[in-house]
């Protein structure tokens, strides 16, 4: 069930914090999903498709990880998209992954917005203990520069978010290459 945990934080939490201590955390757009129409921003709540990172979620859950998505959604805060449309989209993403997954959504520029750690702090209240040594965060906003094309990531907020939390950080490309059964 969706809750408005703070005036500026939406959460759908399905944590089993009493039993699970490892967190596999992900950014949403550009990490777990992309627009089917290849536009920068989705055209409607059904304009998304799972990316390769999402196909590893079931194995992570089997390995005892609690699965969490932390996403900045400025278009929600600005009114460009409706909360009901975003929540509909996230419900469908959850169904498509086939595993219990929690979502934390920051619509505004405040202490919850990545790279600040407010969303993580709210999530952590659901756990008796989090093993940060075995937890990690995957995101596409890594501040990378493509030396061939000169193109840059739009931000480094995902990398800085992980650093602020002392979590191992992976880009989606790095995460896809990981052998989860080692």
Curated annotation (Swiss-Prot):
One GO MF term: polynucleotide 3'-phosphatase activity
GO biological processes: DNA repair
Pfam families, per database record: PNK3P (PF08645)
PANTHER family: BIFUNCTIONAL POLYNUCLEOTIDE PHOSPHATASE/KINASE, BIFUNCTIONAL POLYNUCLEOTIDE PHOSPHATASE_KINASE
Family classification: Belongs to the DNA 3' phosphatase family.
Full protein name: Uncharacterized 20.8 kDa protein in FGF-VUBI intergenic region
Provenance organism: Autographa californica nuclear polyhedrosis virus (AcMNPV)
